[in-house]
């Protein structure tokens, strides 16, 4: 069975915890803190594997987790970083965030990679928190949790030309006649149940080839879910050109080929405006039958008035097929390459200072419940070991230094109220916050006063984790 959609869960590795350790060596009393940092958690990437052409492997495995970073150790030993996880996908895979619907990437080229979950930073060891007034810190940072999310993968086959038409119009027979593909062919509708690709060699054109996609036949109402073809119309979106195959004989039902032509185009337009605007070449098939030969003059005249070029062919006997393929190749040379669903992925990173990461927001949810939001405060919360009194004291000291405590007090927070942040519930204890606000500050030096007057001096802050 052909799988062109999948949902998977990806979880990046957690950062390793920082170590609490003190240097112990003969003849070196009071060696000081030497706890190492935790390792970074492994990232999760999607990678294009040209040997794949379906999302079938994701029907067996849906959850993927990268390796966690290792914890730090004493003697300033840092933990090992977690190994990155690479998940192979076929070319033409579009990646969506399942929660938001946002397009994360469009993977086309072999070897192309897309970062879909970032590993957590490792926590810093206690060596980083030593100060003149706190020479023996007995706390360290916890590792940051890795990102996790559900992804929706959608495969859009990479073909230059797509075959569209009603069921039993002869699309599969045409594909088999011009390529090495061997689709199932039978004299009943919906013989083709899944897309099939074939590489077409152009007669008389040295090295001239293009990829042709055969899709299940469309019927009236396909854009609303009728029939089978609507499930695979996404594969036509990447094509540059459509070959619209008509049954020139009208089939056993005696249909009007021109009505069939308008029916299919109406379904393409209802599904997507981009499909309706794709250039088309019309192939009037089954010209080996007397009914098709009788209908041909009327069909050719009507299509010419509509601005379409029609080619009489018989996929079964090969009549006119070579001329159709050469015309298709020449038309392709005039058409641009299709655009990506998402911008191309960069081979390098550009780092810029993002002040939005430092912003925070305090909200009163109810008389005794408050919430804090913002990347920096949430990250601090996740990396703080609240079971350690010194770590909890540092957390509250930073809240006061950043002005968060002052804002919560202005909102009317009282001792014992609950503060919700990063999925945790913290009980408000204002003693440390008030002490921090009233703690005397050292006098600025002359140089610092000049810098402050010029707006170039910022208040010192403790950094959270590795940058």
From Swiss-Prot:
Stored Pfam families: DUF1967, GTP1_OBG, MMR_HSR1
Entry cofactors: Mg(2+)
InterPro entries (UniProt xref): G_OBG, GTP-bd, GTP-bd_Obg/CgtA, GTP-bd_prot_GTP1/OBG_C_sf, GTP1_OBG_dom, GTP1_OBG_dom_sf, OBG_GTPase, OCT_dom
Subcellular location: Cytoplasm
A GO molecular-function annotation: magnesium ion binding
Origin superkingdom: Bacteria
Alphabetical GO biological process terms: ribosome biogenesis
Residues annotated as domain Obg: 1-158
GO cellular component assignments: cytoplasm
Annotated EC: 3.6.5.-
Amino-acid positions noted as binding Mg(2+) in the UniProt annotation, renumbered to this chain: 172, 192
Keyword GTP-binding: yes
Residue numbers binding GTP: 165-172, 190-194, 214-217, 285-288, 314-316
Gene3D superfamilies to which the protein is assigned, alphabetical: GTP-binding protein OBG, C-terminal domain, GTP1/OBG domain, P-loop containing nucleotide triphosphate hydrolases
CDD domains found in the cross-reference section: Obg
Signal peptide interval: none
Domain OCT span(s) in chain numbering: 352-430
Domain annotation OBG-type G: ranges: 159-333
Alphabetized UniProt keyword annotations: Cytoplasm, GTP-binding, Hydrolase, Magnesium, Metal-binding, Nucleotide-binding
Subunit annotation: Monomer.
Function, in words: An essential GTPase which binds GTP, GDP and possibly (p)ppGpp with moderate affinity, with high nucleotide exchange rates and a fairly low GTP hydrolysis rate. Plays a role in control of the cell cycle, stress response, ribosome biogenesis and in those bacteria that undergo differentiation, in morphogenesis control.
Family: Belongs to the TRAFAC class OBG-HflX-like GTPase superfamily. OBG GTPase family.
HAMAP family (alphabetical): GTPase_Obg
Protein name, UniProt field: GTPase Obg
Organism: Thermomicrobium roseum (strain ATCC 27502 / DSM 5159 / P-2)
């Amino acid at each position: 069975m052909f799988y062109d959609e999948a949902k998977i869960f990806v979880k990046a590795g957690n950062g390793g915890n920082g170590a609490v350790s003190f240097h112990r060596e003969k003849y070196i009393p009071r060696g000081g803190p030497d706890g190492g940092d935790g390792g970074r958690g492994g990232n999760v990437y999607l990678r294009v594997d040209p040997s794949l052409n379906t999302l079938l492997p994701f029907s067996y495995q849906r959850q993927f987790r990268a390796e966690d970073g290792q914890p730090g150790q004493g003697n300033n030993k840092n933990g090992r970083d977690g190994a990155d996880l690479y998940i192979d996908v076929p070319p033409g895979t579009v990646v969506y965030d399942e929660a938001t619907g946002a397009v994360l990437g469009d993977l086309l080229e072999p070897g192309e990679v897309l970062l879909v979950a970032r590993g957590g930073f490792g926590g810093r060891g206690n060596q980083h928190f030593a100060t003149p007034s706190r020479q023996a810190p007995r706390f360290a940072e916890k590792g940051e949790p890795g990102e996790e999310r559900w992804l929706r993968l959608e495969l859009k086959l990479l073909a230059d030309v797509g075959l569209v038409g009603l069921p039993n119009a002869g699309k599969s027979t045409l594909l088999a006649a011009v390529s090495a593909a061997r689709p199932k062919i039978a004299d009943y509708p919906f013989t083709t149940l899944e897309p099939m690709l074939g590489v077409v060699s152009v007669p008389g054109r040295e090295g001239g080839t293009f990829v042709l996609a055969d899709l299940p036949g469309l019927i009236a109402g396909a854009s609303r879910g009728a029939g089978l073809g609507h499930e695979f119309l996404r594969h036509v979106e990447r094509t540059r050109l459509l070959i619209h195959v008509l049954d020139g004989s009208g089939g056993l039902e005696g249909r009007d080929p021109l009505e069939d032509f308008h029916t299919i185009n109406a379904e393409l337009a209802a599904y997507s405006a981009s499909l309706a605007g794709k250039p088309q070449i019309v192939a009037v098939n089954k010209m080996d039958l007397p009914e098709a030969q009788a209908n041909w003059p009327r069909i050719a005249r009507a299509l010419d008035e509509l601005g379409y070029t029609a080619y009489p062919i018989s996929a079964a006997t090969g009549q006119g097929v070579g001329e159709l393929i050469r015309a298709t190749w020449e038309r392709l040379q005039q058409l641009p390459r299709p655009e990506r669903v998402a911008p191309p992925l960069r081979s390098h990173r550009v780092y810029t200072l993002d002040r939005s990461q430092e912003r925070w927001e305090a909200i009163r949810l109810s008389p005794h419940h408050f919430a804090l939001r913002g990347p920096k405060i949430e990250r601090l919360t996740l990396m703080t070991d609240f079971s350690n009194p010194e770590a909890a004291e540092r957390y509250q000291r930073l809240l006061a230094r950043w002005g968060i405590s002052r804002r919560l007090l202005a909102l009317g927070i009282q001792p014992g109220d609950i503060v919700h942040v990063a999925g945790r519930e913290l009980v408000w204890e204002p003693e440390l916050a008030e002490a921090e606000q009233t703690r005397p500050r050292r006098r600025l030096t002359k140089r610092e006063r000049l810098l402050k007057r010029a707006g170039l001096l910022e208040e010192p802050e403790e950094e959270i984790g590795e940058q």
